[in-house]
Amino acid sequence: MGPATPSSLMPYFDPPLPCSFDHEGSKPECYAEHARVIPAVTNFMPPSSVVELTETTPPLFDPISVHRISSDTIVKVEHYHHYVEALNLSMIRAMTTIPVPEVRQIVQHKTFTYLVMEYIEGRTLDQCWSELSHIQRLRVAQTLRGYIDQLRTLTRAVPGTLDGSACVGPFFSAIDAEPFASYDELVDWYNHKVDVVKKMRKAPPDIGTFDDSAPLVFTHQDLNMRNIILANDGTLYVIDWGWSGFYPEWMEYACMARYDDAPQSWKDLIPFITGPHEDMFNLLCDIGWALEVGYMM
């Protein structure tokens, strides 16, 4: 048997976007049929060339395997068949005006996925924040607030990822955050983590329970300064949508507030960008032991 031949794929939505995400059927499995990848009809470049170029160019970031293979193209390599970021980017481009990189091709080879995307000329906020004036920082915050408002127009009755795969993110355990069939299942999962930290005496005595009144909205889940690019033309791009999915609207605040090493001038703007949800952030921090250590309990 000869070596495996790379295959070329593309994001696919049925029915085509824009549309409602609340479909009848077995949930969340029905979303995997709605949002998936299919064989590409045409290729941006030969799939074998994508693989070869990533093997001969050094990664831009460590440990993330992102390779710049031409002046306007990068390839992000995942060590498993991970398509949800391509689906997320395609949905965002179709249903919002949030600037994100264009997905040009998906290549599958052996156990790797190669996401071929547009390269954005510019600097991430962690690289240029100190050079921005107070007014410029406020403009960035106002722009991001508008992006969050757009994301919150994308709703779904069932939490989780766009393609029905397991939930991933800073406040999900590594192995037991399987797709949830309902919002109630998600809340029960989190409240079980509360019970675990109480039982193991790893939580403050006044720890609360999870708020299930907030709507499920599309959430980036890693909106840190390294994932926001101020392009050379002044456009503010958002990158790295691999953790995104439909979660309670307070989740965006929690995921942004968790970065202790961010400048205070940035942290002060987070409540304005996402709305203040410090109570839920504190609760997520309080169950950290159950998420990271006691997730099998």
Residue ranges and their predicted role:
Residues 46-51, 85, 208-211:
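Short Pro/Gly-enriched beta-strand edge/turn motifs at strand-loop
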Residues 24, 33, 272-297:
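Charged phosphate-binding loop/patch that engages nucleotide di/tri-phosphates or the phosphate backbone
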Residues 1-65, 156-160, 293-297:
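Phosphate/pyrophosphate-binding loops and the adjoining catalytic core of nucleotide-dependent enzymes
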Residues 137-142, 150-221:
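An alpha-helical support segment within catalytic cores of ATP-dependent transferases
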Residues 183, 213, 217-218, 231-282:
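Active-site Asp-x-Gly
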Residues 20, 51-176:
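ATP-binding pocket architecture of kinase catalytic cores
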Residues 121, 225, 243-244:
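Short, glycine/acidic-enriched loop or turn micro-motifs at the edges of active sites
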